[in-house]
């Protein structure tokens, strides 16, 4: 066993994950073909569209309107983030709820857990419109509680 505790043998004690290495290579080729600048610009345009739509939802609190990513972190006043995520899931809308592995930041900002939308090049304006439609449900809080 001692001989396998040093490099490079440390990483070669089992069958290499060849399929994932090949898949990772193909994923990089795919992203390069599209172009990372093009993806980033689409992501930011989509985020601007989403913010414009989402900020009109009643009782919504958006924490990062001006960040340079496709991530939108938000809460609905008086709604527990995890409950909102479960509610949205009923409409096939996926968000992440919790502290997003950033508990210290959450504590510094003095906020509770949040919901997070993570937009990328495979998302569409129609999906954002659907999210806003569901968030604008006048009975949302009653249906969650």
Residues covered by each model-derived region:
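Pyridoxal 5′-phosphate
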Residues: 1-145
């Amino acid at each position: 066993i001692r001989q396998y505790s040093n490099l490079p043998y440390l990483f070669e004690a089992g069958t290499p994950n060849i399929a994932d290495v090949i898949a990772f290579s193909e994923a990089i080729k795919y992203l390069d073909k599209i172009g990372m600048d093009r993806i980033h610009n689409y992501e930011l345009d989509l985020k601007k569209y989403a913010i414009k739509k989402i900020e009109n939802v009643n009782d919504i609190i958006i924490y990062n309107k001006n960040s340079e990513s496709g991530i939108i972190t938000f809460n609905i006043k008086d709604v527990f983030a995890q409950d909102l995520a479960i509610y949205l899931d009923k409409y096939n809308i996926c968000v992440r709820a919790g502290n997003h592995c950033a508990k210290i930041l959450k504590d510094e900002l003095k906020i509770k857990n949040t919901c997070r939308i993570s937009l990328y090049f495979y998302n569409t304006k129609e999906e954002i419109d659907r999210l806003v439609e569901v968030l604008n449900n006048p009975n949302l809080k009653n249906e969650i509680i």
